[in-house]
Amino acid sequence: MKFFALFIQRPVATTLLTLAITLSGIIGFSLLPVSPLPQVDYPVIMVSASMPGADPETMASSVATPLERALGRIAGVNEMTSTSSLGSTRIILQFDLNRDINGAARDVQAALNAAQSLLPSGMPSRPTYRKMNPSDAPIMIMTLTSDTFSQGQLYDYASTKLAQKIAQTEGVSDVTVGGSSLPAVRVELNPSALFNQGVSLDAVRQAISAANVRRPQGSVDAAETHWQVQANDEIKTAEGYRPLIVHYNNGSPVRLQDVANVIDSVQDVRNAGMSAGQPAVLLVISREPGANIIATVDRIRAELPALRASIPASIQLNIAQDRSPTIRASLDEVERSLVIAVALVILVVFIFLRSGRATLIPAVAVPVSLIGTFAAMYLCGFSLNNLSLMALTIATGFVVDDAIVVLENISRHLEAGVKPMVAALRGVREVGFTVLSMSISLVAVFIPLLLMAGLPGRLFREFAVTLSVAIGISLVISLTLTPMMCAWLLRSHPKGQQQRIRGFGKVLLAIQQGYGRSLNWALSHTRWVMVVLLSTIALNVWLYISIPKTFFPEQDTGRMMGFIQADQSISFQSMQQKLKDFMQIVGADPAVDSVTGFTGGSRTNSGSMFISLKPLSERQETAQQVITRLRGKLAKEPGANLFLSSVQDIRVGGRHSNAAYQFTLLADDLAALREWEPKVRAALAKLPQLADVNSDQQDKGAEMALTYDRETMARLGIDVSEANALLNNAFGQRQISTIYQPLNQYKVVMEVAPEYTQDVSSLDKMFVINSNGQSIPLSYFAKWQPANAPLAVNHQGLSAASTISFNLPDGGSLSEATAAVERAMTELGVPSTVRGAFAGTAQVFQETLKSQLWLIMAAIATVYIVLGILYESYVHPLTILSTLPSAGVGALLALELFDAPFSLIALIGIMLLIGIVKKNAIMMVDFALDAQRNGNISAREAIFQASLLRFRPIIMTTLAALFGALPLVLSSGDGAELRQPLGITIVGGLVVSQLLTLYTTPVIYLYFDRLRNRFSKQPLMKLE
């Protein structure tokens, strides 16, 4: 009593305490960072190694395997995958969520150093690593276009000036430049002219290398002057190389221009990029794992004026894609929902109390509780994100409950004519324990969430802590500020009060009287009520088993990624045309705003596209509906497939794939894997629960296999190295010399002219000059025939691996898809030597699915323990928890009604319902117990009176919680698909629970009272 009186009798101190909480919250809000979701990125490090000319199998066995053995010993690695392609290996290390990425990077460097002695000596450089996840969508894409500069020049500016500066920005992990390559002098040889002049390809290479050298020439010290010696030993343009003498034929010089076309071009002509239908160079910007997207994008945008100033004015530097606008729009929508929720909750209070002064009290208590939470969020290192703001939106209904319970009880005494000061003291004392029980038991629901491991635990930790802090502050405000304001603002006017609430009061009184009659019937027919309660328990089980489930709601971020997978033998020219065709099809869709893409590099049968959709206000379809509409049009393009997927804020795993979900096949025998992968892929492609089924197994690349006749070669005086050099000089885009410039280094690239590189019959025109000076055609000592060759070799751990990727059809669920995949594997009879397992998001989904029921049971057990401690009873917590089955039925039925799968967001809604619906029972049980202890009445009469007495606050708190969640259900802007499942679950659970628990709780109370009387004759103890 003295505790409450302290705050009621000292209004200045209480007001200043409230102001301190509010000011600290305002300061915390101004300092909080902004992000789409809590920081849940797995620490991922990518290791790269290269050995030019090595085929994929050689890279896998001689480079990837030794590195994997060393890297696999690092503590905290939970997944290691590698891809080896022509001349390069890329290893992706995914660490535990709790592992610090900087510490992991140090361990990776130590492992690379230890493995160095096991690597081939022909590697031009040591393996390197980057702190980045290659499967993560870029945070920004910039394009360079120009009417006056060539693609090579644009690439030069992009890589030399722009990429370097952007990569230095805090939060940026990597800047990939695509769409072309660095400028170079290209020497395009004519084999026929070389043969006629008697000049070998290697002689041309040696002549060019000897003519372009950069060596120190020294200096001369005269008597009074120091002279630096500098010669014109470098040739920097194609014009300078053309007159170069490469050979003498019968005393006549053979110049390079006589046997080759020498042009200023690019290092690798097999690269192409496009944006808005025209050639472009792309800057694809990725962030470090854990870096804040909004803050990183803002830093890059701040550098834009300086970046544009560093390049010529005739080069246009534009932002083609930016992930931040939809994130900001989504957060704006959540903030709008929060404001609407606060307004609706206060409206509920006004409708019931019909007093401006009384309504002012929760109108102050609710914002103070929410604003004060921002201070704790800042101290905990949280951010303003969709989940934390959703927690505050839902908290609106919770924090007002405490104020409503206190305010309504004080108002009841005021209506009875009690003086305000006495009414405030008496009212808060009567419900103080009730409010404390409701708040502590609600916070207890989140204890299992806080202890939950893995990504779901990390994801919802901010949600749980934010909501718990808001409830804690609300508890303090309700027991201090609320009674103080009631004592000083409200007046005791019973007659006037009756007049003010006459209209609504008559309706509420009629409802209350009807409830009393129906409750009296229920207490007389307890068996029927118990049948209803047991039926809800059974219905919960059936609904949970049957409802479709998914990991996380499919988000519409307004961004899509497309991956082109063409025939493995496709030429670059055809692949470039496929890119143009696909971009034209996608760009023509009315929902698409812009499309950029590029192809080329070491894997010529693949390409990437980045698609930005129009804002939601300008399109009617979701991103998934756009993908479904485009899927039919894209399927008509022969020889290639474009797989589209919507960019998500959460993506698990480091492997690059063409779709959102992965199923990985593992085998120690590569031959067995290559035998069974096509069978499994074909079976999965037939499943209606899956879409866009594809594989990363690339073992059908076209290869022209040459067989040397070594005896003939020995007789002709030709060794294998000369033959290999011939092929490399002709078809390898061989970099034979370096041109040094102040800001960069450029290459002289040699190969045969394009008309020869695009025709297999050009092999007939190749020749070498032996030691006798004779021109020997390649066909004299070699035969060739078409064959298949792997374009890439994949590992997971130390096993050969092949990942089958898939998307979900529109309306499909991940639970149905994973179950269908498992059935297909069983029906196929895949041998034990080939193992299958889900990877990435699908793997985390399965792990989460196994723990969902345990999490719910743990939450219920925790609440039971807390209530048992508070009530010093084993029985009363069961009475209170009997409200849960009806809430579960309502939540699951609502999800079914809205055709929404059961996701992690819906799971959180179920957890919240455990905390919400028990409040009704707590208010009933508290007053019934007090009536039995002090009124010497029967259990039936006590629970009947308690139910009628607490009917108004029960309805008020339920409607407050319902209206607090309603804006989430009705939201339709950016990020609505993330908010709606939470709102649907809570509203559905509250509606059904409210209808049933008003009857089931009193009946359960009676049942347990009878059991207590049967097994114990001890009277109820009075707890002071």
Curated annotation (Swiss-Prot):
Record's signal peptide: none
Keyword hit for Cell membrane: yes
GO CC, alphabetical: plasma membrane
Gene3D superfamilies reported in the protein's UniProt record: Multidrug efflux transporter AcrB pore domain, Multidrug efflux transporter AcrB pore domain like, Multidrug efflux transporter AcrB TolC docking domain, DN and DC subdomains, Multidrug efflux transporter AcrB transmembrane domain
Entry keyword set: Cell inner membrane, Cell membrane, Membrane, Transmembrane, Transmembrane helix, Transport
Classification via SUPFAM superfamilies: Multidrug efflux transporter AcrB pore domain, PN1, PN2, PC1 and PC2 subdomains, Multidrug efflux transporter AcrB TolC docking domain, DN and DC subdomains, Multidrug efflux transporter AcrB transmembrane domain
Pfam families attached to this UniProt entry: ACR_tran
Topology within the bilayer: Multi-pass membrane protein
GO molecular function: xenobiotic transmembrane transporter activity
Compartments where found: Cell inner membrane
InterPro entries named among the record's database cross-references: AcrB_DN_DC_subdom, Acrflvin-R, Multidrug-R_MdtC
Predominant location category: membrane
Bilayer-spanning residue ranges: 12-32, 333-353, 360-380, 387-407, 435-455, 469-489, 528-548, 853-873, 875-895, 897-917, 953-973, 984-1004
Cystine connections: none
Subunit structure: Part of a tripartite efflux system composed of MdtA, MdtB and MdtC. MdtC forms a heteromultimer with MdtB.
Entry similarity comment: Belongs to the resistance-nodulation-cell division (RND) (TC 2.A.6) family. MdtC subfamily.
PANTHER family: MULTIDRUG RESISTANCE PROTEIN MDTC (PTHR32063:SF34), PTHR32063
NCBIfam families: PRK10614.1, RND_permease_2
Listed name of the protein: Multidrug resistance protein MdtC
Native source organism of the sequence: Yersinia pseudotuberculosis serotype O:3 (strain YPIII)
